[in-house]
């Protein structure tokens, strides 16, 4: 019988629990649900496995407070850390979540140095950088969940604007995973038709698309303000699963993620949201889009914001 991949989820909060549920439904692999809070991962694991009996899923889920249980993981998704509360920016979380990431990274280095790692913890672009530097893993095996989520928000708002199925919409959001992200209307399409062409056809306006771009930039903040007690978790978890599946099944999908750049887009030693190809070796390729002067200026501004945050943890 073929052995299931081992997937460890570091952090058993809302995103961690949702990830485990999705992995179980899709039967992507056996799960270790880790958390420092005693009883929480164990309780969720039991609940999820009981749900699995009705779903016909034989996936094994183990709740743990011991990092040794992640030993030999094929993939790891990190959600540990404080979530955003109303009035907090992603950047306010830096100092406390950096300490948590350093601890997580040391344990990955010790127990699962061959794993493919996806980071979700905010501020994303900084946390994924800390994981890379502290774990010693190769850069093609450490990525951040950013653009997949931002693009999903952009896709939804565009589908609503054009009154079409979300399946017909493809969009790209570049840059840092924050308010300076760069949703690219020119590279976004409805059934292959670029947004600027649809505007020329009279199906929308530049003004409406700009409003959608602003709403996309504040997509996470909008949910934080409504929830009042935390941040989004269904869409972030689903976005990470898309990335995980491309890795485990060697799908070689092009997904926008926070990837480590070494000269691409003229950027060195930074994690920035760009389109990449994810396969069984991790990041196979970085796709370099040709940007207009205006797009490049917005992208550079977003990158500069990431660079300033990184300086705070160096």
Swiss-Prot record:
Belongs to the LDH/MDH superfamily. MDH type 3 family. The keyword Oxidoreductase applies. InterPro entries: L-lactate/malate_DH, Lactate/malate_DH_C, Lactate/malate_DH_N, Lactate_DH/Glyco_Ohase_4_C, Malate_DH_type3, NAD(P)-bd_dom_sf. It catalyses: (S)-malate + NAD(+) = oxaloacetate + NADH + H(+). It comes from the Bacteria. The keyword DNA repair does not apply. Disulfide bonds: none annotated. GO terms for molecular function: L-lactate dehydrogenase activity; L-malate dehydrogenase (NAD+) activity. GO terms for biological process: lactate metabolic process; tricarboxylic acid cycle. NAD(+) binds at residues 11-16, 35, 97, 120-122. The active site is at residue 177. Its EC number is 1.1.1.37. Catalyzes the reversible oxidation of malate to oxaloacetate. Keywords: NAD, Oxidoreductase, Tricarboxylic acid cycle. CDD domains: LDH-like_MDH (cd01339). Substrate binds at residues 84, 90, 122, 153. Pfam families: Ldh_1_C, Ldh_1_N. This is Malate dehydrogenase.
């Amino acid at each position: 019988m073929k052995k299931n991949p081992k997937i460890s989820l570091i952090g058993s909060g809302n995103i961690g629990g949702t990830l485990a549920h999705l992995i179980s439904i899709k039967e992507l692999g056996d799960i270790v649900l880790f958390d420092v809070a005693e009883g929480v991962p164990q309780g969720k694991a039991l609940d999820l496995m009981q749900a699995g009996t009705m779903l016909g899923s034989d996936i094994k889920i183990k709740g743990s407070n011991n990092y040794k249980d992640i030993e030999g993981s094929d993939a790891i998704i990190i959600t540990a850390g404080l979530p955003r509360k109303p009035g907090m920016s992603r950047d306010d979380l830096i100092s406390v979540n950096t300490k948590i990431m350093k601890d997580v990274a040391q344990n990955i280095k010790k127990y699962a140095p061959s794993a493919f790692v996806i980071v979700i913890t905010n501020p994303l672009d900084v946390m994924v950088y800390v994981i890379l530097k502290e774990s010693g893993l190769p850069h093609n095996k450490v990525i951040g969940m950013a653009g997949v989520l931002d693009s999903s928000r952009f896709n939804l708002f565009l589908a609503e604007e054009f009154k079409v199925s979300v399946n017909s919409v493809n969009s790209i959001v570049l840059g840092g995973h924050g308010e300076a992200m760069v949703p690219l209307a020119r590279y976004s399409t409805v059934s292959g038709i670029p947004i600027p062409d649809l505007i020329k056809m009279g199906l929308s306006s530049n003004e409406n698309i700009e409003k959608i771009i602003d709403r996309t930039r504040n997509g996470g903040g909008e949910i934080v303000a409504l929830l009042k007690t935390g941040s989004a978790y269904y869409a972030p978890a689903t976005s990470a699963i898309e990335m995980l599946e491309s890795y485990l099944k060697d799908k070689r999908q092009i997904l926008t993620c926070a990837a480590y750049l070494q000269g691409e887009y003229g950027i060195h030693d930074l994690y920035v949201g760009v389109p990449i190809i994810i396969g069984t070796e991790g990041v196979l390729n970085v796709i370099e889009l040709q940007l207009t002067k205006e797009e490049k200026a917005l992208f550079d501004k977003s990158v500069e914001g990431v660079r300033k945050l990184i300086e705070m943890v160096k």
